[in-house]
Amino acid sequence: MFRTLPRMLVAAVVLAAGVVAAAAPAEAATSITINGGSAGRTFDGVGAVSGGGGNSRLLIDYPEPQRGQILDYLFKPGYGAALQILKVEMGGDTNSTSGAEPSHAHFRGDLDCNRGYEWWLMEQAKARNPGIKLVGLPWGAPGWIGNGTFFSDDLTGYYLSWLGCAKQHGLTIDYLTSVQNEKQWSADWTVTLRNALNANGYSAVKVISGDSWPGDWGPASAISTNTAYRNATDVLSAHYTCGYLSAQTSCSVPASVIGTGKTLWSSENGSQDYNDGAKPLARGINRVYLDGKMTAYLNWDLIAATTPNIPWPTVGLILANQPWSGFYSVGKDAWALAHTTQFTAPGWKYLDASSGYLGGNRANGSYVTLRSPSTGDYSTIVETMDATAAQTLNLNVTGGLSTGQVHVWATNLNSNNPADHFGHTADITPSGGAFSLTAQPGYLYTITTTTGQGKGTAASPAQGSLNLPYSDDFDGYAKGKEAKYLMDMEGAFETSACGAGRSGTCVRQAAPQKTIPWKKFVDPYALLGNVAWSTYTVNADVLLEKPGSVQLLGRVGSQDTGNQGAVNAYYLRISDAGAWSIQRNNTSQQVTTLRSGTATALGTNSWHKLSLGFSGSTITASLDGAVLGTVTDSTFPAGQVGIGTSTGETAQFDNLAVTGSGGGSTSVLRNAASSRCLDVPNVSQTNGTQVALWDCNGGGNQQWTLTSGKQLLVYGAKCLDAEGASTSAGTRAIIWDCTAGTNQQWNANADGTITGVASGLCLGPGGTGNSAPVTLQACTGSSAQKWARS
């Protein structure tokens, strides 16, 4: 039932049998006493966050069996990440990082408990692991709440109605957070919430105060002087207690916070790539307890299920951004969590005397030990992320714990070979409670008396493009659902009965007022499609329910991480009075009107057809089959499509169609000499970032589209660029905003070389290892200058 990890450099033996030679010279031995009688706090779990927001969006659109496989890797015990806590966003119709999630109550008196995908996700998690703990937290809220004031009586009722929706879905919510995520908290309202929960049958729901930005433990200070607030608060929490986007080497918490005696959580961590975040996670999960007595650790986010042009496109435990192909990739981050989650359970106890830093030195690594409260079972999790040599660990078990056989599981986090991740490497029978093992640098180990662990075997199909033509008439959806592949960026675009006498189902923007935002508030819009789409026309039937405007978007690419209104895109905007414009936006939100005019008024409650076409640098806007205007602009060569409205406009859309052919030639570029891929380091979207080699991982920063204009696009809006338009050997290959310049044009040749149109030089790396920089080079015929598209 267990898989053995090939090439794992662990030596584990009974002390009496002698020590097996390790693969590297060991440092001085570290002695660890596993004492079941040690004091320690109660473990609450390791989990992840779905929300903040839209990052799980495409998961629900996956076909079976891939959707079920992904869910198994996330939630099924003994299979993958085996999450113990799932925190979800209480949708607020507003963008909360990577998109907007719909509210269960768009306006006062409204209630629909089937909107969005978080209910479905919680149901799927519970079906696989009935013991998983569920947490609810709002990032933003509909504008009717308190007439724009977050902490209000309206908010109390809003929370209660959300819990009622959970009950309709057969879900019991374990925790609610009494704050607006990372924005604001209120001691008085927390007391109001606690009283309301008790009065309405939810006394078992625990209240979390905090979820604040790093270093902000304001609620902890407040409870020291406010008895009612203290009594209303079950958990104090904070975000990124080990540092934001950090290696998570230190996770300090003020002594005064620990001294409150309250349960402490590190309730959001990570924000890192689904593979590259594994080492920080390995450190942080142990060190939040060692340094700060925090008993829960949540990774943001759960899954990277959004398209590569959206902020944080590869952050999560699994990459799942292609429901049209079924492709997914389980990251090293998932296995880093599994080393704790598959060997413990909420309610276990930390053993403080059996936890610490190897040899008393942080650089050697850390270890924590937890025990079952009802049996003699225990698990010790050891990480050696920063160690420079092998270390011998001498362990001695005492204090009523099992002295029976222990099982060793290991992951080599220095390796990108999936075979080196989460393997069962040894079984040890202690002698008199004593045993030893040798821990190698850069590894994560679990030493346990438990059984039942496993590594999932489901495999992903190959990647594939979403090709043209594409269309959706929206018929066949249930009311209140999000149309397939359509991702809300602001507002709430959901299926509804069509108006003005039209039969069937349409998509309606249903948020009728400005929200209480989390990010900058902008007009509602939603996106769909392939960032490589280039030559196409997007068409949609539109109906304005009241005075305002609607819009079509095209060639939509990168988006600013802090402002969803700052996006590379073209727009056709038209109002009920007939005023229209073709506009260009960018990631600095510099909106340029390329052409404008006035057409026959659209009016309200009548259907019209809008079209926005792209052919090379020619952009054509049409209304009801008549051309409104044509412009020439080559700023953005490719991108997605979208629909949108003015703020508060509850417009309808039907018969969305994108006509054209192909989806662009999108693939990784695999170097023939190294088998590594052309990569934008750290998923950067910053102009001037030099590309390099990296192990192929399917991330959006490795997906290159060769356009008909000979550009190599990444993220749908950045072009591979010969820096400074230089034609000299040694010129850095970088990413830059697309300009249509010849220094951004490339020939993909039959012999596998890629040559610059302006320079004639070959694209080549400065080595074969990870991070080898890529430059223009004199062509030599070497395999190092040849690339395979796959």
Where are these regions (language model features)?
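N-terminal catalytic cores of secreted or lumenal carbohydrate-active enzymes
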Residues: 29-173, 178, 187, 191, ...
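Aromatic/acidic polysaccharide-binding cleft in carbohydrate-active enzymes
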Residues: 266-344, 348-362
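Carbohydrate-binding surface patches
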Residues: 356-404
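C-terminal beta-sandwich/jelly-roll accessory domains of carbohydrate-active enzymes
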Residues: 383-492, 496, 500, 514-516, ...
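Secretory/extracellular carbohydrate-interaction modules
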Residues: 511-581
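Localized edge beta-strand/strand-to-loop motifs within extracellular or lumenal beta-rich domains
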Residues: 606-620
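Short, solvent-exposed beta-strand-to-loop segments that form ligand-recognition rims
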Residues: 623-642
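Extracellular glycan-recognition/adhesion modules and their associated mucin-like linkers
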Residues: 662-685, 701-728, 744-770, 786-790
